[in-house]
């Protein structure tokens, strides 16, 4: 289930980028409220299989973000993303530990990856940041139980503090 948020003209240009920031429940809940975001979907980036069944295959929990680049650009989306992650933590966000909880920015568009590299390069702490930036080679939608999890079950665990989680949510 993709969540539709942005009510722009149907002719608006759409682009897609993928963010991995630990447990995908919180990442989806935060990003879906950003202005310019059309839709979000919980998924898995860059694993080796095309299924959610079976053993761990190297994927990163991620959120597919469909957005209107005339309303919010990639650099701005990355800035928002950095509000909810610890960019220095390798394979760990909050209490979630393991390679699937690594931080990453993925895309099929090289311009998105170049923007992400530039975003980090221009930070004073660039040498400490462990966010991976890679082409999206494989994406698998997460099972329905993970879609919109914190919307449906707002008291479930989330590594992102509530005051930040809903910072951009309209009343």
Outline where the language-model segments fall.
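Flexible coil/turn and secondary-structure edge motifs
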Residues: 1-171
């Amino acid at each position: 289930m993709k969540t539709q948020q942005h009510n722009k003209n149907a002719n608006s240009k759409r682009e897609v980028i993928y963010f991995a920031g630990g447990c995908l429940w919180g990442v989806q809940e935060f990003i879906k409220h950003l202005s310019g975001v059309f839709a979000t979907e919980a998924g898995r980036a860059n694993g080796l299989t095309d299924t959610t069944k079976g053993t761990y295959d190297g994927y990163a929990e991620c959120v597919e973000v469909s957005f209107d680049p005339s309303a919010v650009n990639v650099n701005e989306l990355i800035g928002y993303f950095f509000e909810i992650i610890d960019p220095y933590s390798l394979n760990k966000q909050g209490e979630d530990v393991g390679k699937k909880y690594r931080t990453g920015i993925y895309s099929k568009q090289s311009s998105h990856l170049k923007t992400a590299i530039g975003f980090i390069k221009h930070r004073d702490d660039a040498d400490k940041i462990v966010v991976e930036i890679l082409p999206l080679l494989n994406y698998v939608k997460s099972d329905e139980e993970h879609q919109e999890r914190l919307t449906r079950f707002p008291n479930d665990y989330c590594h992102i503090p509530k005051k930040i989680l809903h910072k951009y949510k309209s009343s």
